[in-house]
C-alpha cells in the first residue's frame, strides 16, 4: 500500500504519530555511521560490476522532480522539465532505448509537504531527484537523499550552507549565493558605501546568504549595520513597521534578499513611505529579475515602483542553443515569461540523462535494497519498508560530478566544492520602462562592462583598479552615487564625550553656559559641524571627575564601548587608538618634546674658533698655503719680489698667503696667470671673511643657554625622573617605546606642578625634564620667564583629531569639513582666538655647534678655486716645456761633450743633465729665457747666411 493510503487509514492520533516518526526519520544524525558503512558496502559490491558480463538495460528509469508548482520558479520549471524529458526520450543518441520517466511532486511551499513528497518519490525507486527550489526544503530532504543514496540535483536552492560535506548526495545545478554576495560586496566597495542595511526573508536562504554578505563586507572594512528579517509570508503591515524602523537609521543603502513571490511587496511599501526618493540606494538579489522575467509584460506601475533599483541576475552565456530554447518557450508557455531557473531545470534533466548514459555504458545496473536502519522503527504504522537504498547511488553521483558538457545555461562542470565553474552575474539598473545592463560580475574578473566569457582567456584580475561599470541612475533620477547615509532620524542626539580637564583649559574645559563646554577644540568641532549638509543634533557629556585630567585611552574606550558616539578634545592620534576608532583629519599638529631647565652659558676664551668647524678651519688653512704656493710658482719667473734665497722665498709664500686674508699683501702680481688665480682667491676670501664675521657676531652677542639634558637620548640614559602630564599618551610611549622604567615617570597635574617640579630638580624631589606634547609646551613656556626651554628635536610627529566609532560615515564628512576650514583660514582664526601667545624668549635652546659653518656650505667655492689653480698651472708648465724644447739642441750638444770627457757615465747619469737643465729653465727669469731664445735665433740666421755665401763661392769656382 502507498504512503498516502496508509495515512488515510489511521486515526487522528495515529496521524500525529506519523508526523513525528517522519521527522525522526529525516533527522537521524546518529545513524550516519551506519549509513556510511552501508554506503561502502554497496559501493564495493557495485565496483566489481565491470568484471561481470554485459547486463541487460532496463526499459525505463524513474527520476523524481519536486518543487512548488504555483510559484514564479515552479511555473517556469515544470514545463522546462517536461520539455527536457521529451527531448531526452526523442534523442536516440542518449540512453539508447531507455525511457526517462519523470515523476512530479508539488512541495506547495511547505517543508512538511515537501518532505512527504520526497518520501513518495523514493517509494517509486527513483535514481535521482530534481529539485527542490527552496533551500529550506533542500535542507530537510537532503537527509533522506543521504540515507537512501539518491542524488538530489537542485536548480533553485542557492543557500551557501548546503555543503557537500554534510550532504554528499546534494548537488546544486544553479549558482551559489556565496558568489552573489561577493558580487554585491564588490559593488558596494566600488560605489564607496561602507554600511548597509540587509532586508531578508527569515529562512535558511535569507539568513545564510546575508551571513555570507556580512563576512565578505568585514574583509573590506565594511559592515551590515542592521539585519532586518521579514517573516515568510509577512503582510504589508509587518513590512511597513519594519521599513519605518530602518528608515530611522543612518544607512540609506538597502540590500533586499527575499523570495520572488512576495518581494515586490517590499518596494510597494517603501514607495508609499517615500523611501524610493533621492539619497536612497536599493540593491536586489536575483529574486527581482526572476520575478520580472517571469511576467509576460512588466506593467508601468511595477516599473514605477522599481525606478533606480540595482539588481543582480544569473548570467548565462548567449548561444544558439539558448536562443532556440527561448524561441521554443513561447510555444510551451505563451502567457508566461521566461526566467533563468527554467534553463537550470532543463539542464538538470539533461545532466541526469547524460550521466545515466555513461552509467549504463560502463556496464552498471540499477538495484535497490532495504535499508536496515528503517527496520529498527518497530511499532510504526508507516510502511518504511517501501523506501529502498539505491545501491549504485555513490557511483552514479561520481559520474554526475565528472560530467562536462554544454547546456542551455552554458558549460556544465563542477569544481571541488561542487559549485558550477565560472559563476557570473549580470548587473541591472531598473530605470525607464525596462531593466538596463550596466555591467557584469564574475569571480574571474570582478565587475566589468564586457561579457565574462571574453575574459576567461586572460589571467584573473579582481583588483579594485580593474573594476568598471556603466553609469547608473539611482532613485530620484540621481546619476552620482549617493552618500549612502544620513544622520539617524531617531530623535537621539549625537553623544559627544569631552575630557573634563584641569590643566591647559584653553584647549577644552567645562563651561557654565550652554553647551556646557568651551575651548579651542570645541570651536573647531562646532565650526566643522556647521559645514555639514545636514543637521546634527548633539549633546556634550563631560568625562572625568574634574580633579585630575582623565585618561584619554579610557575616553577612547568609552567610544568603542558605544557609551559615546564621538570623543572631542585634545585627543592625540596614535597607532594603538586607530585600531579601535576612526579619527578625523588632524586639526592641529602635535608631537612629543623635552622641556628642561636652562642656564646662561659662560663665555669661552676660544669663542673666536666657534664660527667654523674643525674641517672648515683645516681646509681653509690648507687653501691659504696652496694658493700662496701657486702664486709663487706663477710669479717666480716674472716677479723679482718672488725671487731670491730659498729662505726669503719661503717667507714670501707664507706672508703673501695669509696677508690675502686681510687684502693687505704688498707683493704685486705681474703675470697674467698669477693675477687670474689671485682674483678668484680674493673672492673666496671675501665670502669666508664675511661669513666668519657674521657667525662670530651672532655667537658673541646672542645669549647662549645650556642644559644638562640635550634631548630625548640623553634623558633616556640619565636615569633621572621624568615628568609627564596626567592622562596623555606620553607615559605609555616612554614605557613601551623607549623602555623607560615606570618608577622614573612622575605624573603632573597642572602647569603649577610642571613649573615647581622643574625648578626643584631631581635632587629636591622634582624632575630633570618634562616630556609632553608641543601644543601644551607652547602654553607652558609663556609663563616660565624663560627659565625653561625645549631641548633636542621633536621626536614624534602626530596630530589631534576627533575619535568616532569604527566605520562611522560622520568621520569622513567631518574630515572633509576640517580640510575646508583649513583651506579657508578658519582654523587659523580659531587658533589666534584661543592660543595667540607671544613668547618673549625662544622656545628652543640654540646650540652653538648647530650654528657652526661647515665645509658643506663652502665646498663649491673651494672647488672653483682649485680648478682655477689647476688650469693656470697647466698653462704655465705647457709654456715651460715649450721653451725647454726650443733650448733642447743646445743642451744636447753640451751633453755629448760631457759624454766624451766622461765615457764611463751610466745611462741614468746621462739623463740627469736634462732634468737639471729643465729645472734651470724653470728657475730662470722670463726675460733671460727670451734673450737666450733671441740670441739663438740670431745665431741660426747668421749660420744660414754663411752657409748660403759658401755655397755661392763654390759655385763660382766651378764656373
UniProtKB/Swiss-Prot annotation:
GO cellular component: chloroplast; chloroplast membrane; plasma membrane; plastid
TM ranges: 614-634, 644-664, 676-696, 858-878
Ranges per topology, Extracellular: 36-613, 697-857
Keyword Protein transport appears in the UniProt entry: no
One of the Pfam families matching this protein, by short name: Lig_chan-Glu_bd
Compositionally biased region (Low complexity): 943-959
Membrane topology (Cytoplasmic): 635-643, 665-675, 879-959
InterPro entries tied to this protein: ANF_lig-bd_rcpt (IPR001828), GABAb_receptor_plant_PBP1 (IPR044440), Glu/Gly-bd (IPR019594), Ionotropic_Glu_rcpt (IPR015683), Iontro_rcpt_C (IPR001320), Iontropic_Glu_rcpt_pln (IPR017103), Peripla_BP_I (IPR028082)
GO process annotations (BP): calcium ion transport; calcium-mediated signaling; cellular response to acetate; cellular response to amino acid stimulus; cellular response to cold; cellular response to mechanical stimulus; response to wounding
Induction: The induction by glutamate, gamma-amino butiric acid (GABA), malate, aspartate, acetate, wounding, touch, and cold stress stimuli is abscisic acid (ABA)-independent, but calcium-dependent. Cold-mediated induction is rapid but transient.
Tissue: Highly expressed in roots and at lower levels in leaves and siliques. Expressed in seedlings, cotyledons, roots (e.g. root hairs, epidermis and cortex cells), stems, leaves (e.g. vascular bundles and hydathodes), and siliques. Expressed in root phloem.
CDD domains documented for this protein: GluR_Plant, PBP1_GABAb_receptor_plant
Keyword annotations of the record: Cell membrane, Chloroplast, Glycoprotein, Ion channel, Ion transport, Ligand-gated ion channel, Membrane, Plastid, Receptor, Signal, Stress response, Transmembrane, Transmembrane helix, Transport
Highest taxon, organism lineage: Eukaryota
Location of region: Disordered: 893-913, 936-959
Subunit structure as annotated in this protein's UniProt entry: Forms a heteromeric channel with GLR3.2.
Family: Belongs to the glutamate-gated ion channel (TC 1.A.10.1) family.
Full protein name: Glutamate receptor 3.4
Organism this protein belongs to: Arabidopsis thaliana
Amino acid at each position: 500500500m502507498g504512503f498516502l493510503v496508509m495515512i488515510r487509514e489511521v486515526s487522528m492520533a495515529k496521524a500525529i504519530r506519523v508526523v513525528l516518526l517522519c521527522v525522526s526519520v529525516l533527522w537521524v544524525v546518529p545513524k550516519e555511521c551506519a549509513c556510511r558503512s552501508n554506503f561502502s558496502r554497496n559501493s564495493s559490491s557495485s565496483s566489481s560490476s565491470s568484471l561481470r558480463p554485459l547486463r541487460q538495460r532496463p526499459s525505463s528509469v524513474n527520476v523524481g522532480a519536486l518543487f512548488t508548482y504555483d510559484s514564479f520558479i515552479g511555473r517556469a520549471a515544470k514545463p522546462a522539465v517536461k520539455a527536457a524529458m521529451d527531448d531526452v526520450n526523442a534523442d536516440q543518441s542518449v540512453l539508447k532505448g531507455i525511457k526517462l520517466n519523470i515523476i512530479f511532486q508539488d512541495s506547495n511551499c511547505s517543508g512538511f509537504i515537501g518532505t512527504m513528497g520526497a518520501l513518495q518519490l523514493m517509494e517509486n525507486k527513483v535514481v535521482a531527484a530534481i529539485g527542490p527550489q527552496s533551500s529550506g526544503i533542500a535542507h530537510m530532504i537532503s537527509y533522506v537523499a543521504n540515507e537512501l543514496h539518491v542524488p538530489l540535483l537542485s536548480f533553485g536552492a542557492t543557500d551557501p550552507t548546503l555543503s557537500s560535506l554534510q550532504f554528499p548526495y546534494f548537488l546544486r545545478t544553479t549558482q551559489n549565493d556565496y558568489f552573489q554576495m561577493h558580487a554585491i560586496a564588490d559593488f558596494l566597495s566600488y560605489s564607496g558605501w561602507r554600511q548597509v542595511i540587509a532586508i531578508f526573508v527569515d529562512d535558511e536562504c535569507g539568513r545564510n546568504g546575508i551571513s555570507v554578505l556580512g563576512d565578505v563586507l568585514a574583509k573590506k572594512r565594511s559592515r551590515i549595520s542592521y539585519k532586518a528579517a521579514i517573516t515568510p509570508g509577512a503582510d504589508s503591515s509587518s513590512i511597513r513597521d519594519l521599513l519605518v524602523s530602518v528608515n530611522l537609521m543612518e544607512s540609506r543603502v538597502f540590500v533586499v534578499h527575499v523570495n520572488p513571490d512576495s518581494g515586490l511587496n517590499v518596494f510597494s511599501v517603501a514607495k508609499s513611505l517615500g523611501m524610493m526618493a533621492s539619497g536612497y540606494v536599493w540593491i536586489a538579489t536575483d529574486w527581482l529579475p526572476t520575478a520580472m522575467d517571469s511576467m509576460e509584460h512588466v506593467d508601468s506601475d511595477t516599473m514605477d515602483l522599481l525606478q533606480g533599483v540595482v539588481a543582480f541576475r544569473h548570467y548565462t552565456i548567449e548561444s544558439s542553443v539558448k536562443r532556440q530554447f527561448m524561441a521554443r518557450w513561447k510555444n510551451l508557455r505563451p502567457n508566461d515569461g521566461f526566467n533563468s531557473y527554467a534553463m537550470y531545470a532543463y539542464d538538470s534533466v539533461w545532466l541526469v540523462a547524460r550521466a545515466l548514459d555513461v552509467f549504463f555504458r560502463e556496464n552498471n545496473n540499477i538495484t535497490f535494497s532495504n535499508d536496515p536502519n528503517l527496520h529498527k522503527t518497530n511499532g510504526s504504522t508507516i510502511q518504511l519498508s517501501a523506501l529502498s537504498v539505491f545501491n549504485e547511488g555513490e557511483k552514479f553521483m561520481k559520474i554526475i560530478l565528472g560530467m562536462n558538457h554544454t547546456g542551455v545555461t552554458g558549460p556544465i562542470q563542477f569544481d571541488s566544492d561542487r559549485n558550477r565553474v565560472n559563476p557570473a552575474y549580470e548587473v541591472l539598473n531598473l530605470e525607464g520602462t525596462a531593466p538596463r545592463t550596466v555591467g557584469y560580475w564574475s569571480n574571474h574578473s570582478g565587475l566589468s562592462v564586457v561579457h565574462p566569457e571574453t575574459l576567461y582567456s586572460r589571467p584573473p584580475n579582481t583588483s579594485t583598479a580593474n573594476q568598471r561599470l556603466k553609469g547608473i541612475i539611482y532613485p530620484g533620477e540621481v546619476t552620482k552615487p549617493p552618500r549612502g547615509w544620513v544622520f539617524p532620524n531617531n530623535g537621539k542626539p549625537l553623544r559627544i564625550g569631552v575630557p573634563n580637564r584641569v590643566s591647559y583649559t584653553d584647549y577644552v574645559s567645562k563651561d557654565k553656559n550652554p553647551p556646557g563646554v568651551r575651548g579651542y577644540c570645541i570651536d573647531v568641532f562646532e565650526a566643522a559641524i556647521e559645514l555639514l549638509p545636514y543637521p546634527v543634533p548633539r549633546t556634550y557629556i563631560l568625562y572625568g571627575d574634574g580633579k585630575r585630567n582623565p585618561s584619554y585611552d579610557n575616553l577612547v574606550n568609552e567610544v568603542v564601548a558605544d557609551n559615546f558616539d564621538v570623543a572631542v578634545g585634545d585627543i592625540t592620534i596614535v597607532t594603538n587608538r586607530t585600531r579601535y576608532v576612526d579619527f578625523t583629519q588632524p586639526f592641529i599638529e602635535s608631537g612629543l618634546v623635552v622641556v628642561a631647565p636652562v642656564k646662561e652659558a659662560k663665555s669661552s676664551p676660544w669663542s673666536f674658533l666657534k664660527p667654523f668647524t674643525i674641517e672648515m678651519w683645516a681646509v681653509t688653512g690648507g687653501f691659504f698655503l696652496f694658493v700662496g704656493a701657486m702664486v709663487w710658482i706663477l710669479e717666480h719667473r716674472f716677479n723679482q719680489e718672488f725671487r731670491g734665497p730659498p729662505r726669503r722665498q719661503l717667507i714670501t709664500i707664507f706672508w703673501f698667503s695669509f696677508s690675502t686674508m686681510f687684502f693687505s699683501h704688498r707683493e704685486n702680481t705681474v703675470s697674467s696667470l698669477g693675477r687670474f688665480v689671485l682674483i678668484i682667491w680674493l673672492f673666496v676670501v671675501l665670502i669666508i671673511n664675511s661669513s666668519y664675521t657674521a657667525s662670530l657676531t651672532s655667537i658673541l652677542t646672542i645669549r647662549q643657554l645650556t642644559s644638562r639634558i640635550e634631548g630625548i637620548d640623553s634623558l633616556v640614559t640619565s636615569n633621572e625622573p621624568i615628568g609627564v602630564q596626567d592622562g596623555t599618551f606620553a607615559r605609555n610611549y616612554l614605557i613601551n617605546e623607549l623602555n623607560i622604567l615606570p618608577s622614573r615617570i612622575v605624573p603632573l597635574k597642572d602647569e603649577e606642578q610642571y613649573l615647581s617640579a622643574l625648578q626643584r630638580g631631581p635632587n629636591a624631589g622634582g624632575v630633570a625634564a618634562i616630556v609632553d606634547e608641543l601644543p601644551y609646551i607652547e602654553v607652558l613656556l609663556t609663563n616660565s620667564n624663560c627659565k625653561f626651554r625645549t631641548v633636542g628635536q621633536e621626536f614624534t610627529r602626530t596630530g589631534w583629531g576627533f575619535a568616532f566609532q569604527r566605520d562611522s560615515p560622520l568621520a569622513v564628512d567631518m574630515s572633509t569639513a576640517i580640510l575646508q576650514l583649513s583651506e579657508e583660514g578658519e582654523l587659523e582664526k580659531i587658533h589666534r582666538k584661543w592660543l595667540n601667545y607671544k613668547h618673549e624668549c625662544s622656545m628652543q635652546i640654540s646650540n652653538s655647534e648647530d650654528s657652526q659653518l661647515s665645509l658643506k656650505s663652502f665646498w663649491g667655492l673651494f672647488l672653483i678655486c682649485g680648478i682655477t689653480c689647476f688650469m693656470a698651472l697647466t698653462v704655465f708648465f705647457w709654456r715651460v716645456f715649450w721653451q725647454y724644447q726650443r733650448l733642447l739642441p743646445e743642451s744636447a750638444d753640451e751633453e755629448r761633450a760631457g759624454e766624451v770627457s766622461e765615457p764611463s757615465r751610466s745611462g741614468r747619469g746621462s739623463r740627469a743633465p736634462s732634468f737639471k737643465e729643465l729645472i734651470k729653465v724653470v728657475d730662470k727669469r722670463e726675460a733671460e729665457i727670451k734673450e737666450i731664445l733671441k740670441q739663438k735665433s740670431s745665431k741660426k740666421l747668421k749660420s744660414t747666411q754663411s752657409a748660403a755665401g759658401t755655397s755661392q763661392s763654390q759655385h763660382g769656382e766651378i764656373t
